[in-house]
Amino acid sequence: MLLDIYIIYFVALLPVVFLISYVYKKDLYPEDKREVFITFLLGASIILFLDILIPAVEIFNNTFFKGISNKAFMSFFRAATLEETLKLLVLYFYASKLDNFDEPMDAIVFATAASLGFAAIENVNYVFHTTETQSQAFSVALARAFSAVPLHGLNGVIMGLFFGLALFGDKDNKKYLFLALAVPIFIHGIYNFFLLINAGILIYIILFILFSRSSKIFNRIRMGQQLKGHEYWERTYTINSSEIYMNVLKITGIIIVGVIVLELIFNA
């Protein structure tokens, strides 16, 4: 029985280890492993803040929204906005302040580490707290190894890409900072929404598209590394935390307006 539990833990955490190793090795000039691991742990700690925020959010959602609009708010705000915002804050407040954070690829590595740190703790919690038997736990762990965990990892790549462009790009820095949060929230929200409306098969289309895009992103960034060498990239833009908070408010406003529209259409 104890061996079975270890096997379930192994299945739940193996995709996390595989993905973070894959991304780390893609970097031609790897980051300090200790700093990446700390970022991973900070990503895992997100669950503590969610435990505080989610009850209030769920009360709000269940009070004002029903049916399809309730599912939309659950998907795009309760899950996507809260989780992706906290990941971005880890990237901003810790990783981007490091001396070694000196090129666009670093943003991808650290964003992915934060995302997979959260994915690891979420996966273990989900596997053991939403199932009643070890057989169910194993099945859930296996299913999430090919769905939820890759989603978090690939979303980290997307977030890191735009965050890196915001810091090191030559133009449109504010736009890229907005996209560093907006795009992962949109992808994450769509993923969760498909699950809640029992259209789970569509999530694999999302994952396939994300994987294809991520491969192109890696090739593009690695080519830039090869051309520039291990030369210091000068930051072209200084990000303020107030900008991130304002972007969160903008995205939240868009989500609430969209959910209200759904409420008026389907539940009026």
Model-derived regions: residue spans:
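Hydrophobic alpha-helical segments at protein termini of multi-pass membrane proteins
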Residues: 1-268
